[in-house]
């Protein structure tokens, strides 16, 4: 099955498709193993001093990958970096994406796991809008969400939440946190 990189990136960033992560890794670096080496070098280059990669999928110790770890601070730095790349910023702002048909599969619709994009009526705020997001879940980290938001003055904030018990809890607490921040920054 052959897709352009943009399709694989949409599959990875919108719905966290593990097969897309491995395909991107192998395609970009020649093998998943070489990609892991590249990602650890890139993490150092970006100043992500508390991050180590040992798989392309993003699974951690709770899922049997003992050398995969990061911190909220490093993830926020990474989010800031990927929001500078317009193709990635565009992808993480989508509520949905339709994977095109290919020679062996019919196309299918992917839906973002971000309630700010898929259920905006539940988590609307007059103080900010969400312009990018990535969610995930592992046994060790729990339910996680990274949000990039901006207010009417264009001020951007990146908010990371790890260890959530449920998506609803994360979105309620992140909305409160972002509203607090935007109400109090000058």
What kind of region is each of these model predictions?
Residues 1-11, 15, 21, 25-34, ...:
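Active-site-proximal loop and beta-strand segments within enzyme catalytic domains
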Residues 16-17, 74:
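Membrane-embedded alpha-helical core segments of multi-pass
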């Amino acid at each position: 099955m052959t897709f352009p990189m943009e399709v694989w990136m949409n599959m990875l960033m919108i719905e966290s498709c593990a097969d897309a992560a491995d395909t991107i890794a192998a395609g970009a670096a020649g093998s998943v193993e070489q990609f892991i080496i590249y990602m650890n070098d890139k993490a150092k280059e970006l100043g992500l001093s508390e991050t180590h990669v040992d798989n392309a999928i993003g699974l951690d110790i709770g899922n049997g990958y003992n050398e995969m770890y990061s911190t909220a601070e490093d993830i926020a730095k990474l989010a800031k970096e990927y929001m500078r790349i317009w193709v990635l910023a565009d992808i993480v702002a989508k509520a949905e994406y339709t994977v095109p048909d290919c020679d062996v599969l019919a196309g299918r619709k992917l839906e973002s796991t971000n309630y700010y994009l898929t259920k905006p009526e539940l988590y609307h705020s007059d103080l900010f809008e969400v312009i990018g997001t990535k969610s995930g879940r592992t046994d060790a980290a729990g339910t996680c969400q990274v949000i990039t938001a901006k207010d009417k003055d264009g001020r951007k904030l990146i908010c990371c939440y790890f260890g959530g018990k449920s998506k609803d809890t994360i979105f309620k607490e992140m909305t409160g946190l972002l509203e607090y921040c935007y109400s109090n920054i000058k």
